[in-house]
């Protein structure tokens, strides 16, 4: 539910790709091994590496799909890429996925579009505020449950994972439960928690359901600890909660994104003479080693705090 936002909250330590593999293996047993090839491609053990690179790599079809799709639904034109040309220019050499040199500019446009979409959509300050609010709601729920305070989710499946934190270690036994979860389980629970006697939980839940999100401000430099403490004291007084509880409403964080790092996975350009270069090593490269686009994640510190009444 809620994609990556709750990934580390519902089942700590379980990456979504690990969960995907467990589901595929479960289905493979049900279909008597018919997914064995698909699993080998997914895990990168299939003898043709380019197939894995097509579904999990710098130029995988998922990235091409979500950039155009999200660009359309959000109205942010910068995410539109010429995926059809990129697909036509894809080729294979020595089992590795490569791109013909004619598509260099299309690849550079793809990388720049991804960078712009992250800062204009995925890491937009309103998105960050909403996501952090939902995460903190579940953090508070887990804290209350640990203290013995009753908190019930709107569905038995979500309730199961919140009440049984050890279930994540035995997730293979509970895949059916997990696969029944969706965004509705989460939102229905948050609506119910708007009326919970715990003030922190009910207030956070109302912020989300009523769309009165925490204000967020990106900072040029980290905020002083004394100033953060001061803001929490002010919030504690205004909401009549403790200073420790005010940390749920006044907190700092960091939004980060890396456009392209050849140390992770490379985008190989195949030239007519048969030579192969990384996209960052071509002549007059837009994505080059000296550019902030190539290396080093771009990070922005932020602070969240309640809106003035």
Regions found by a protein language model. Give the residues of each.
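Histidine-centered, transition-metal-coordinating active-site segments
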Residues: 2-309
